[in-house]
């Protein structure tokens, strides 16, 4: 058996091929797993569990079917869907996890996270993140009418796209010191995350020992997952 990890699907109605690929994954590979972990940015945007978007209901039902089949499903918030709440988690049968979680997997201690907190060189993003994660601001935003939230979210996405276009790729990648610090804080030799859309397996030194950072790919033209078994940790790409 295996434990599966995915991230950065950025599901939206404008990308039906990705949605179809995810549904096939849920109906196939995911049903064979010991557990499924979604490490953020499942959706391109999330403005509240009360959004009646049919795509959200469709995804909730599909994930719930996996959970009901006996495969526990877990979710860590990303930078796009950090407002996903308890209502959607309940409807989809997912367990919400904190932004950093250590798992004991087949004899390995593995730290999992979305990954945006590791991009400490991007000071502008980190300042923005600190603001939008304030509970009072989230409560205020979620109390606004849905049409207002949609407008604000659209404006924020446009601003983010414009800001990122002028940033270097290095700034938007993880900071190596932040990676080592997180792994040593949790005393782990394995880290799995998404966010950067740069799938790879990186070797490093943490806790004065060899360590590994596995980065999930985004679902653009193909799927990406990390498959952890008793024998191996594999980064796998597959057609939709």
Swiss-Prot record:
It is a peripheral membrane protein. One of its GO terms (molecular function) is UDP-2,3-diacylglucosamine hydrolase activity. Its main location: membrane. Pathway: Glycolipid biosynthesis; lipid IV(A) biosynthesis; lipid IV(A) from (3R)-3-hydroxytetradecanoyl-[acyl-carrier-protein] and UDP-N-acetyl-alpha-D-glucosamine: step 4/6. It catalyses: UDP-2-N,3-O-bis[(3R)-3-hydroxytetradecanoyl]-alpha-D-glucosamine + H2O = 2-N,3-O-bis[(3R)-3-hydroxytetradecanoyl]-alpha-D-glucosaminyl 1-phosphate + UMP + 2 H(+). It is an enzyme of class 3 (hydrolase). CDD domains: MPP_YbbF-LpxH (cd07398). It is found in: Cell inner membrane. One of its GO terms (biological process) is lipid A biosynthetic process. Its cofactor is Mn(2+). The keyword Cell membrane applies. Binds 2 Mn(2+) ions per subunit in a binuclear metal center. Substrate binds at residues 79-80, 122, 160, 164, 167, 195. Mn(2+) 1 binds at residues 8, 10, 41, 197. Its EC number is 3.6.1.54. It comes from the Bacteria. GO terms for cellular component: cytoplasm; extrinsic component of plasma membrane. The keyword rRNA-binding does not apply. Keywords: Cell inner membrane, Cell membrane, Hydrolase, Lipid A biosynthesis, Lipid biosynthesis, Lipid metabolism, Manganese, Membrane, Metal-binding. Mn(2+) 2 binds at residues 41, 79, 114, 195. Belongs to the LpxH family. Hydrolyzes the pyrophosphate bond of UDP-2,3-diacylglucosamine to yield 2,3-diacylglucosamine 1-phosphate (lipid X) and UMP by catalyzing the attack of water at the alpha-P atom. Involved in the biosynthesis of lipid A, a phosphorylated glycolipid that anchors the lipopolysaccharide to the outer membrane of the cell. This is UDP-2,3-diacylglucosamine hydrolase. It comes from Escherichia coli (strain SMS-3-5 / SECEC).
């Amino acid at each position: 058996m295996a434990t599966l990890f995915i991230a950065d699907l950025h599901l939206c109605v404008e990308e039906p091929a990705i949605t179809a690929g995810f549904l096939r994954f849920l109906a196939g590979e995911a049903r064979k797993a010991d557990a499924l972990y979604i490490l953020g940015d499942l959706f391109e945007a999330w403005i509240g569990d009360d959004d009646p978007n049919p795509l959200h209901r469709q995804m909730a039902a599909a994930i719930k079917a996996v959970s009901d089949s006996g495969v526990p499903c877990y979710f860590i918030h990303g930078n796009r869907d950090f407002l996903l709440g308890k209502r959607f988690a309940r409807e989809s049968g997912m367990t919400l996890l904190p932004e950093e979680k250590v798992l004991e997997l087949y004899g390995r201690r593995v730290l999992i996270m979305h990954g945006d907190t590791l991009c400490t060189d991007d000071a502008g993003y980190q300042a923005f993140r600190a603001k939008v994660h304030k509970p009072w601001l989230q409560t205020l935003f979620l109390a606004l009418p849905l049409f207002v939230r949609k407008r604000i979210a659209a404006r924020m996405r446009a601003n983010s796209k414009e800001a990122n276009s002028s940033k270097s790729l290095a700034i938007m990648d993880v900071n190596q010191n932040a990676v080592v610090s997180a792994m040593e804080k949790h005393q782990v030799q394995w880290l799995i995350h998404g966010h950067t859309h740069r799938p790879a397996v990186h070797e490093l030194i943490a806790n004065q020992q060899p360590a590994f950072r596995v980065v999930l790919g985004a679902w653009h033209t193909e799927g990406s997952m990390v498959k952890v078994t008793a024998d191996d940790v594999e980064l796998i790409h597959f057609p939709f």
